[in-house]
Amino acid sequence: AYSKLGVFDYERELGQSLLVDLELELDLEEAGLSDKVSDSVDYAAVSLAIRGLAQSKEYLLIEHLAREIITMLFSKFDKLEGVLVEVKKTIVNAQQFSGEPSIRLYRSRL
């Protein structure tokens, strides 16, 4: 995903490439038997929804984007019971930081 995300103005002005990793919890029994996408969650639709959300506005924190991703997924995909999302910045412009900052956030519908 690509987003205008970051605490610093220059991060939001340039925009950032992000990696979004998901673990989706749902009952897969029917999909396993029927082999129909309609009995599961359409992963292409999930991906497009996340891209649209990430590009829809500016974010200061990856924590906020992760929470909004989960909220949006629960609102669009009724079959989801739980979501674990990891959002990772792929390029960091801070000399004092090595690696890729990321957060993982889990929520269940219950």
Spans of model-derived segments:
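N-terminal, polar/charged subdomain of small-to-medium soluble alpha/beta proteins
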Residues: 1-110
